[in-house]
Amino acid sequence: MLPQLAGLRMTEATNSILHAAPPASARLVLSGITKRYPAVVANSEVSLTVQPGEIHAVLGENGAGKSTLMKIIYGSVKPDAGSMWVDGVPVSIRNPQEARALGISMVFQHFNLFDTITVAENVWLGLDKQLTLAEVTQSITAKASEYGLDIDPARPVHTLSVGEMQRVEIIRALLTQPRLLILDEPTSVLTPQAVDKLFVVLRKLAAEGCSILYISHKLHEIRALCTACTVLRGGKVTGVCNPTQESNASLSRLMIGAEPQQLEHRPGQTGRPLLQVQALSLARLDQFGVDLNGIDLQVCAGEVVGIAGVSGNGQRELLYALSGEDVRAAPGMVLIDGQPAGALAPQRRRVLGLHFVPEERLGRGAVPTMSLAHNLLLTRTEHVSCGGWLNLNALQAQAAGVIARFNVKAGGPQAVAKSLSGGNLQKFIVGREIAAKPKLLIVSQPTWGVDVGAAAQIRAEILALRDAGCAVLVVSEELDELFEICDRLHVMAQGRLSPSIATQQATVELVGAWMSGLWQAAATGDAHVAA
């Protein structure tokens, strides 16, 4: 028996003739894994084999059971049935500590970090306590430099953006020197250049024998990186393939049963400015924030303007200033439909026609313990009477409409927000704001964590909103997404905003260079300030 297996409880199924012993060479084997919840079967008879040194993709639409399956492997969720082998030895992993003892590390879609302590302290909690905090801090700095993941070990987690939190999770997993590494959407916060560098590292890890389970909705990444793929639909395995021999279209058919709709992005008819930001400069709210320096931005009716950039370069601070969470700006620095709004609270800005989708799903986008119907009330008040009474029937009907229109997999309008998968909650939050038919929509990471079919629908809805005369500002780290739906692009770096450039004239290489703040020399001819 492997030394790290000492003390682990063996599965009862190992004594059953129904499950023959797997090949001893396999790093991980799952057989007949089933997990039931009161309203749904998350996994049904799932079988999966991962070889040493293999980069194995797990594909599936939102709610297909991917995250539940990964949590079972990592010991966070107990299966109702099925067997698991690690390096040929049958095991039942009762908790993440036992998983880490087996050499299994995971980066979750929803992060497991304590807000009130520092990055280094969070990482230290999951490592061998024989290391001092100072040694862990040095290791974080070295690993961050090696992988191009900019992070300060001394920062409290509550000061980090969502993208920066994901970097912490990636570094924490890599510091455990895993033999099986589970990555859930690991590149959503990286520049194209950093993605390439991460892929070099992952291939090196695989060449050294580390197995990698890779969950991503970026089909081109899976085809470029992975050598095996298991597809889930409705909690069941529907296919196994070699993604290097598949096209994006064929992978989509395996995953959602059809090819995603093709967007037709025609030039829009722009109207009057609905958002104007003029010389916006704000000092950081805390020592770990980013100063905003001379931001000039304009979004007109009938256009989609995108802001690209690596997370942590001032996007959060800008979004707070635009949404009304930060009201320190002079009134005239932010104009909504011509009205000074820099000092207005979020509710007053909604009266002017602004709707906003934050990057944080739970906490800012939705209240975890409230139903989907009641979460509509965060930004919609038409079902509240003057006396404060709720029209519950109308509220539930409206929530049901969003659920149906955006194909949200949930137990109905009364389902609490925290019961949804990350992708399905994202669809509901984005759908809630789009269905309100705003004058101005500001959306951060509109398709973060959603499957290709849902992403295509959300992007189509954004373009339809634009064609109806809405002004849309999209902040995203998905360059493919920005190129697909935006009419103009900006890049944010170190608290400054680049000139805008017509999307048709932009390239991935140019935008990648601008992410480093190198736009002064390039901002000629094609680039222009939209102010």
Write out the residue ranges for each language-model feature.
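Glycine-rich phosphate-binding loops of nucleotide-dependent enzymes
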Residues: 5, 11-531
